[in-house]
Regions:
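A short, N-terminal "cap"/entry segment at the start of jelly-roll beta-barrel domains
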Residues: 1-43
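Conserved short histidine dyad/triad with adjacent acidic residue
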Residues: 40-60, 94-95
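Conserved hydrophobic/aromatic beta-strand scaffold that supports enzyme active sites
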Residues: 46-48, 65, 90
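Short, conserved beta-strand element in jelly-roll/cupin
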Residues: 51, 60-75
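A generic "binding-loop/recognition-motif" signal
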Residues: 52, 81, 97, 106-107
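Short acidic-glycine-tyrosine-enriched beta hairpin
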Residues: 79-95
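A short hydrophobic beta-strand segment most commonly corresponding to one strand
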Residues: 92, 99, 105-115
Length: 115
């Protein structure tokens, strides 16, 4: 029992990893990602992710559940409607999703990814 069977998600749960989207995917700005990957079990990952303002192309090969904790973003599927996501919103992005993610206000999300 204990830490092996229960874990809080927080920015203190893991060492932060700072990265950026590949330059060829950046549409606007200079988005910087900070990821706290709290758990990795086989094909499952969970933690927290934060991004500064910017816009880049996304292409999902994995399934992801997200809950926006802070900030404001717009996710637009190629050929589809723009979806505004803000603190309190939860959603799933499925494999095959292609489009853009635009961070208007620094955004923090909880995530669970299955590859």
């Amino acid at each position: 029992m204990g830490e092996d069977t229960f874990r809080f998600l927080s920015r203190n749960a893991a060492a932060p990893v700072v990265s950026r989207p590949p330059p060829n995917r950046v549409v606007a700005g200079d988005p910087v990602f900070t990821t706290w990957n709290a758990e990795e079990r086989g094909n499952l990952y969970c933690g927290m992710w934060q991004c500064t303002p910017g816009k880049w192309r996304i292409q999902y090969e994995e399934w992801e559940y997200c809950r926006i904790v802070e900030g404001l973003s717009v996710i637009t599927e190629d050929g589809g409607a723009a979806r505004i996501v803000r603190a309190g919103d939860s959603f799933v992005i499925r494999p095959g999703f292609r489009g853009t993610w635009e961070v208007l206000e620094t955004t923090l999300k909880d995530y669970v990814v299955a590859t």
